[in-house]
């Protein structure tokens, strides 16, 4: 990248090196899918989740070491916020803040999972894909909200290691953005594996004492018993709300996010947004 070309680069990261792909996306999800594919009856499902974590952490640690060794690159742990057009305040986990000024700033903060508040559902039972890949013990029965790619990947993988899976979504079918033929094939596979699906349904309330999740589907109520985890996989939200874009004068749109030209540059010269 730029550091290899001799440019001085400060890389600011608020969580873990590698972003979504290494930590909560491609790497752990495909690892879990691979391990689940080879899961044998009678094996310990907890070991599958723990091995997924080990492999993810190994790669993350390796990437972190490599990043810190790059010449001309300074790695800074913390959350960045604009205080002016070319100035960032970076606050680390200890609450310490340093100020960084640069002629060029590239915003690449990605997105986070959208979360739902379900009446009665304790925080420790609610998950997104971020929490899922830190889970060391397999749920006995997981309710998955959503019917997109992430929801389906996790439904099939967890079912394969012995977790009972119930999946429901407000959508009319699985994979709403795909062609109907693909959705039909997926639905046939869900049915074959005993994964219960409810479409046009929403979560109404969770009862902790009985671990019962109540859904509404039109005028009907559906009771899903003995649910110990709920995975929310209903889309993502841009990580731009805490960047202080107003202080920098960077224009954004509620629907489009940060506005850029074809070269990724915002309305503020030298400030770029690439994803």
Name every feature range the model reports, one short phrase each.
Residues 3-22, 161-174:
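Glycine-rich FAD pyrophosphate-binding loop
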Residues 12, 107-109, 145-146:
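Conserved N-terminal Rossmann-fold NAD(P)-binding element of oxidoreductases
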Residues 17, 112-114, 150, 173:
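Conserved Rossmann-like nucleotide-cofactor binding loop
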Residues 21-102, 177-201, 209-210:
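N-terminal Rossmann-like dinucleotide/flavin-binding domain of flavoprotein oxidoreductases
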Residues 54-64, 133-134, 139-143, 149-215, ...:
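Rossmann-like dinucleotide-binding cores of NAD(P)H-dependent redox enzymes
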Residues 84-86, 90-116, 127-129, 134:
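Glycine-rich active-site/cofactor-binding loop and its immediate structural neighborhood
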Residues 95-104, 219-229, 267:
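Core beta-strand elements of the Rossmann-like FAD/NAD(P) dinucleotide-binding domain
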Residues 122-138, 225-275:
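FAD-site-proximal beta/loop scaffold in flavoenzymes
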């Amino acid at each position: 990248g730029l550091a290899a070309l001799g440019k001085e680069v400060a890389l600011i990261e608020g969580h873990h090196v590698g972003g979504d792909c290494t930590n909560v996306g491609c790497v752990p999800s495909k690892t879990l899918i691979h391990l689940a594919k080879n899961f044998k009856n009678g094996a310990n499902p907890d070991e599958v989740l723990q091995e997924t974590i080990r492999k993810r952490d190994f790669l993350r640690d390796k990437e972190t070491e490599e990043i810190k060794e790059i010449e001309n690159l300074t790695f800074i742990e913390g959350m960045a916020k604009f205080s002016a057009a070319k100035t960032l305040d970076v606050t680390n986990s200890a609450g310490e803040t340093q100020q960084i000024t640069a002629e060029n700033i590239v915003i690449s903060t990605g997105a986070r999972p959208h979360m739902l508040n379900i009446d009665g559902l304790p925080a420790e039972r609610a998950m997104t894909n971020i929490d899922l890949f830190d889970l060391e013990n397999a749920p006995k029965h997981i309710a998955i909200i959503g019917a997109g790619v992430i929801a389906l990947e996790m439904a099939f993988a967890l079912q394969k290691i012995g977790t009972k899976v119930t999946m429901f979504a407000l959508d009319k079918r699985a994979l709403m953005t795909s062609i109907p033929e693909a959705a039909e094939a997926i639905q046939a596979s869900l049915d074959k594996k005993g994964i219960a699906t409810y479409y046009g349904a929403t979560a109404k309330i969770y009862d902790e004492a009985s671990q019962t999740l109540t859904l509404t589907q039109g005028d009907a109520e559906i009771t899903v018993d003995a649910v110990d985890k709920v995975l929310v996989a209903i889309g993502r939200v841009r990580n731009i709300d805490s960047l202080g874009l107003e202080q920098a004068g960077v224009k954004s749109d509620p629907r489009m996010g940060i506005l850029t030209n074809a070269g990724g540059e915002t309305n503020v010269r030298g400030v770029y947004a690439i994803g």
